[in-house]
Amino acid sequence: GLKDWWNKHKDKIIAVAKEMGKAGLQAA
């Protein structure tokens, strides 16, 4: 289910989210 998918991918998702957050702050 969704929780299994999240547990499998969360590290990558979090890393990407952090990178996007940094880019957003720099662009602002």
UniProtKB/Swiss-Prot annotation:
One of the record's GO molecular function terms: toxin activity
UniProt modified residues of type Alanine amide: A28
GO cellular component, one term: extracellular region
Compartmental location: Secreted
Key words of the record: Amidation, Antibiotic, Antimicrobial, Secreted, Toxin
Function per UniProt: Shows a broad spectrum of activity against both Gram-positive and Gram-negative bacteria. Also has antimicrobial activity against S.cerevisiae. Has insecticidal and non-hemolytic activity.
Protein name (Swiss-Prot/TrEMBL): U1-poneritoxin-Da4a
Native source organism of the sequence: Dinoponera australis
